[in-house]
From Swiss-Prot:
One of its GO terms (molecular function) is serine-type endopeptidase inhibitor activity. This is Bowman-Birk type proteinase inhibitor B2. It comes from Hyacinthus orientalis (Common hyacinth). Keywords: Disulfide bond, Protease inhibitor, Serine protease inhibitor. GO terms for cellular component: extracellular region. The keyword Transport does not apply.
Length: 60
């Protein structure tokens, strides 16, 4: 199973499977996201952010 990659992890738990609260703004939340929120950006482009504690691969 390939997990989404998070570039800006807000909180990361690396014990066992890495899990994090991801701060990335994306065009569409991944299908496993349980709490997807719309984010208004400075450019006016509508983006989304997954606000649930998910199994991400932490890039940082």
């Amino acid at each position: 199973e390939q997990r989404p990659l998070c570039n800006e992890c807000f909180i990361c738990d690396r014990s066992g499977d890495p899990r994090c609260l991801c701060e990335d703004h994306v065009p569409q939340c991944h299908e496993g996201c349980h709490q997807c929120e719309k984010v208004d950006t400075r450019s006016g482009t509508t983006m989304y952010q997954c606000r649930s504690f998910e199994y991400y691969d932490c890039a940082n």
